[in-house]
Design a protein with these regions (language model features):
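…and closely analogous acidic/polar surface helices at protein-protein or active-site interfaces
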Residues: 57, 76-89, 98-126, 141-146, ...
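Bacterial N-terminal signal peptides that target proteins for export
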Residues: 2-11
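Von Willebrand factor
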Residues: 114, 136-139, 149-191, 202, ...
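C-terminal motif of bacterial Sec signal peptides marking the signal peptidase cleavage site
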Residues: 20-21
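Acidic, polar low-complexity linker/tail segments
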Residues: 26-91, 96-105
């Protein structure tokens, strides 16, 4: 009797948790519909507490049209490689101010940044720029270039200005990312900014409010790695909205790069491009996609028109997302912010707020 009671209580608790929204969260990025009957959906899967859900297979998804399940054998549903329709960029900004270059810790920084590039470069196009007290960034290696070789060259570089233009570097980095995304070769484009610093902004070429406005308008994810005696977590967390590693021990630089690389890697793997062949042959239809994983489930839905659909569909066909109106998905904590304090778009790429460095 006690076992039955415990089971009923457990089931009741599970139902309450599900009702409270503790299942998986699926967020639609874009979808494609093309003849003969191809439907493709690009979306993310996360837990209720915003943890990425990776490694789902086609069998972990159930597709419904007009609330009726579509046979997996009939739909031939599959997960396509995201590279056919999407590209992800990561820009790493490395603090090369006097306090970093003269610290004696450059070999550790170079090793940590190189391993970061190796790991993140598996999933994204990575570029590296450096900053010091100067008004503008200095390119170390462009997107998709030899990251390890470029970072190694930092060993022989000296700052043009020993101060730290951290705020200005973030704003200019957002501009660089936005420009790269605007000229991407595929319709779905995403950007991540990662900043390493050993302290705080000293140049005062731009204010913290300038940085906040630029981040609000960028639709770009941002992370910060801070390792040094002058590190202030509260200041850095305003920049690293998706994640901040802060330590006043310079020896923690490897730990910081590893932690942020792991978070970006996991975030990259939360994206899925699910493709299937629709059995519908005419009219408007509602599609629901249910994902099951991490001991829970969740759904997303949208509508499509099947006019002119027919046989001979191959689900491996490249989707036809809108090239002329590319989409990016703002980071959750920007998109969820009240309208009066956020301006992150769900379509296109807004440029960061206008800013001119104080020279």
């Amino acid at each position: 009797m006690h076992e039955n009671l415990n089971m009923r209580l457990a089931l009741g608790l599970c139902a309450l948790l599900s009702a409270a929204g503790c299942g998986l969260k699926l967020q639609l990025v874009d979808h494609s519909v093309k003849k003969p009957s191809n439907v493709a959906v690009y979306f993310t899967v996360e837990t209720h507490d915003n943890m990425p859900v990776a490694n789902l297979t086609p069998q972990d998804f159930v597709i419904y049209e007009d609330r009726q399940p579509v046979s997996a054998l009939e739909s031939k549903q599959t997960i396509l490689q995201p590279e056919v329709a999407a590209i992800h960029y990561t820009l790493l900004l490395v603090d090369m101010s006097g306090s970093v270059v003269d610290s004696g810790d450059m070999p550790k920084l170079i090793q940590a940044a190189s391993s970061f590039g190796d790991r993140v470069g598996t999933y994204q196009k990575v570029a590296v720029y450096s900053f010091d007290g100067s008004p503008h960034l200095t390119q170390v290696v462009g997107f998709g270039g030899n990251v390890r070789g470029g970072i190694a060259s930092l060993a022989t570089r000296r700052p043009r200005d020993p101060s730290t233009n951290l705020n200005g570097a973030v704003i200019e980095g957002l501009r660089l990312l936005s420009h790269e995304m605007e000229h991407g070769p595929v319709p779905l484009r995403f950007g991540t900014l990662v900043v390493f610093t050993d302290g705080t902004d000293r140049a005062h070429r731009a204010s913290a409010d300038d940085v906040s406005r630029a981040l609000d308008g960028a639709g770009i994810e941002s992370y910060v790695i801070g390792a040094g005696q002058e590190v202030d977590r509260s200041q850095l967390s305003r920049i690293g909205r998706q994640g901040t590693f802060a330590s006043q021990n310079p020896a923690d630089v490897q730990k910081g790069f590893d932690e942020i690389a792991a978070r970006i890697e996991a975030a990259s793997r939360r994206y899925y491009l699910l493709s299937y062949c629709s059995p519908s042959r005419a009219g408007e239809h509602e599609v629901e996609i249910e994902a099951k994983g991490a001991g829970s489930s969740g759904r997303l839905n949208y509508r499509f028109n099947a006019e002119g659909f027919g046989p001979n569909c191959d689900p491996n066909t490249k989707p036809s997302f809108d090239v002329h109106h590319p989409r990016s998905m703002p980071p959750p904590n920007v998109a969820d912010r009240p309208a009066e304090t956020a301006a992150a778009p769900s379509q296109g790429h807004a440029k960061p707020a206008s800013w001119t460095p104080n020279r």
